[in-house]
Regions:
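Alpha-helical metal-binding/catalytic segments enriched in His/Glu/Asp
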Residues: 1-31, 152-157
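Short glycine/serine/threonine-rich phosphate/pyrophosphate-binding segments
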Residues: 3, 33-35, 114-115, 139
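Structural motif
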Residues: 4, 21-23, 47-50, 102-104, ...
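Metal-dependent peptidase/peptidase-like ectodomains
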Residues: 32-103
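Acidic, glycine-rich active-site loops and adjacent beta-strand->loop/helix elements
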Residues: 25-33, 55-56, 134-136
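Active-site-adjacent substrate-binding region
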Residues: 74-153, 158-174
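Short, hydrophobic alpha-helix immediately C-terminal to the catalytic nucleophile
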Residues: 7, 38, 116-119
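Alpha-helix C-terminal capping segments
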Residues: 11-15, 42-44, 119-124
């Protein structure tokens, strides 16, 4: 799902004027050590890291309602591999609120995202993980909500278009 969203963001950015080079990378071996993210982020050396992933939809009986289907893209503030960059998270939340893009703040007690490797690569980069709530995660019948997927694509497109050198420096060094 993250790869599909990255491709759609690339399509949205095609022909648009912005100051950024956006790399959409489909990584491998995330579950066994973020290996693909380590090698690709070391090669790319990003100024800002954006991971597109999935998370558990907890909207089931007895679930903690951490992330629910149909309530927007998940903005990960913590997982076992990274505590998301507060300045970048605050910037993204501001973009979501201004553009009326639905979002949910979420966390993982176990497991991580490629953001965990990106934020430590080379000299480091402020990083954020956007996670799509999924019912029956890691199965052959996973279910996502189209509105959540659309929110993911919209916020990443908007984020890339909104960043310039001054904004990146402000986020990085605030």
């Amino acid at each position: 799902v993250g790869c599909a969203a990255a491709v759609e963001v690339l399509q949205n950015l095609q022909g648009e004027k912005h100051e950024n080079i956006y790399f959409g990378v489909g990584t491998v071996q995330e579950e066994v050590g973020l290996r693909g993210a380590k090698t690709s982020s070391h090669k790319i050396q990003p100024d800002i890291g954006i991971a597109l992933d999935t998370t558990i939809a907890y909207d089931f009986p007895g679930g903690d309602k951490n992330t629910e289907l149909g309530k927007g893209v998940g903005i990960m503030f913590k997982d076992s591999s990274m505590i998301g960059h507060k300045g970048l998270r605050d910037y993204v939340i501001g973009l979501c609120e201004k553009a009326k893009i639905p979002y949910q703040l979420t966390f993982l007690e176990r497991g991580g995202t490629d953001g965990g490797a990106i934020h430590m690569s080379h000299i480091g980069a402020p990083s954020i993980s956007f996670c799509l709530p999924v019912r029956y995660l890691h199965s052959h019948t996973s279910i996502v909500h189209q509105d959540d997927y659309d929110a993911m694509v919209k916020i990443v497109t908007l984020l890339v278009k909104s960043l310039d050198k001054d904004t990146v420096n402000k986020i990085t060094y605030q």
